[in-house]
Amino acid sequence: QHP
């Protein structure tokens, strides 16, 4: 997942 992207931050």
From Swiss-Prot:
The keyword Secreted applies. Its main location: secreted. The modification Proline amide is found at P3. It comes from the Eukaryota. GO terms for cellular component: extracellular region. Keywords: Amidation, Pyrrolidone carboxylic acid, Secreted. The modification Pyrrolidone carboxylic acid is found at Q1. The keyword Metal-binding does not apply. It is found in: Secreted. Functions as a regulator of the biosynthesis of TSH in the anterior pituitary gland and as a neurotransmitter/ neuromodulator in the central and peripheral nervous systems. Belongs to the TRH family. This is Thyrotropin-releasing hormone.
